Amino acid sequence: MAKEIKFSEETRRALEAGVNKLADTVKVTLGPKGRNVILDKKFGSPLITNDGVTIAKEIELEDRFENMGAQLVKEVATKTNDVAGDGTTTATVLAQAIIREGLKNVTAGANPILLRKGIQKAVTVAVEELKNQSRIVETQEAISQVASISAGDEEVGKLIAEAMEIVGKDGVITVEESQTMNTELDAVEGMQFDRGFVSAYMVTDVDKMEAVLNDPYILITDKKISNIQELLPVLEQIVQQGKKLLIIAEDVEGEALSTLVVNKLRGTFDVVAVKAPGFGDRRKEMLQDIAILTGAQVISEELGYDLKEADLSMLGRASSVKVTKESTTIVDGSGDKKAIEDRVTQIKHQVEQTTSDFDREKLMERLAKLAGGVAVVKVGAATEVELKERKLRIEDALNATRAAVEEGIVAGGGTAFVSVIPAIGTLIESLEGEVKLGAQIVKKALEEPLRQIAINAGLEGAVIVQNVVNSEAETGFDALNEKYVNMIEAGIVDPTKVSRSALQNAASIASTFLTTEAAVADLPEKEDAGMPGTGMDGMY
């Protein structure tokens, strides 16, 4: 296929136009007075959201060169979401600012390679300064503040803080849609491990690509299953009972897998197979954990059990099991409470005895899965449109809270970025030439999140930024109440991990963007000319 090529200034302007179209759409959502964006969906009602990455993923531009620019910024939002789970709008705003300031310098004749070096140096200093300013999150109140700011809702903040209190820092919290109008917390015992279904044909919900089994039997074995004959005796008993089955095995392959899939598709029985978590001796211990939690017996030849002789009494039970491509969550296993408590005590004893940090970490993970349980935030709303919007906000808040527990918090509302500017100023004094210009680009861009928050609140951004720059440390602008406050004391905080990831990803993409000198895109296909007219319109 023929290609269209653009060079230098023409390339950069086309790419920048795409960057601006995407960023301008996303940045209207920033801050407590940010607006929402409505997204058209081919099926179902439109989605209204303020989630940066959700908006960015929907944007495809007609012009191929502009679209390339938009896709680059989309990568900033996506990467930030993958790493931190929140801060995608902030990352987009920072990327746009660095690109805008950088292009001014490139157009004026600056070398983009040296600019990039300066940008990288400045970001390294800024990230280090953010870490220095970071405060550890210890109280339930601090967790509540982080979640409240991210979701823009105090009630949600309290709910997530309560969930974390119940399951602990290492517990599992999931977000589900409620059948009622109320948003509530439901905490249940459960376990999650990082193994998903062995075949995508086993899913029960194609849209979410997940399999949900209610009240299933659970078969646990440490062997590889490739012959369906080994499973037939227990499968026949399952079919007679009309129940669903979760198989946890070293692997399920060959004839066994194909037979299970075919019968699942035919509706003969509902079965999902997953690989056993962990490796070696740790796998054996984790299988035993799952067995104790569900009241099952691990079917292992080492223990003298043969799969062909397995019956329903050796299988575990749970109220529900949710399996995705990457994880399996077992909720409300029907194991003996005393046996579970004994197992928890045993693992705690092992934690005290071990001298290996790695072993201790893995034991603590097992302890959290066995003792922590699963908290479910059930999101309710009057309409489906509001429900989806609210669910996205709560998922963001949950991600922000986890990030805060992991790396601490800094002043929110764009204040943390402004507060690292003096450190970059010190760096700039030690630099020369175009590397110095690169650092100055970052210095200017760091003001942008605060400026945009002020603009979205209907205020003059430049004035607000100047006032915060001249204020004491941690003093920022509370856009909701339109006053200057100590952000930490006021509970307006951001997770350090979110702020750090947003800046690093924005700078990474933006600095690479500036080094672009040519762009290549497919030429649009020409439409075939129609049949020539006969000159006798309307006659056949």
UniProtKB/Swiss-Prot annotation:
Changing N214K: In strain: ATCC 43603. It catalyses: ATP + H2O + a folded polypeptide = ADP + phosphate + an unfolded polypeptide. GO terms for cellular component: cell surface; cytoplasm; extracellular space; peptidoglycan-based cell wall; plasma membrane. Changing A339S: In strain: ATCC 43603. GO terms for molecular function: ATP binding; ATP-dependent protein folding chaperone; isomerase activity; unfolded protein binding. Its EC number is 5.6.1.7. ATP binds at T29, L30, G31, P32, D86, G87, T88, T89, T90, G413, D478, A479, L480, D494. Keywords: ATP-binding, Chaperone, Cytoplasm, Isomerase, Nucleotide-binding. CDD domains: GroEL. PROSITE patterns: CHAPERONINS_CPN60. One of its GO terms (biological process) is response to acidic pH. Together with its co-chaperonin GroES, plays an essential role in assisting protein folding. The GroEL-GroES system forms a nano-cage that allows encapsulation of the non-native substrate proteins and provides a physical environment optimized to promote and accelerate protein folding. Belongs to the chaperonin (HSP60) family. This is Chaperonin GroEL.
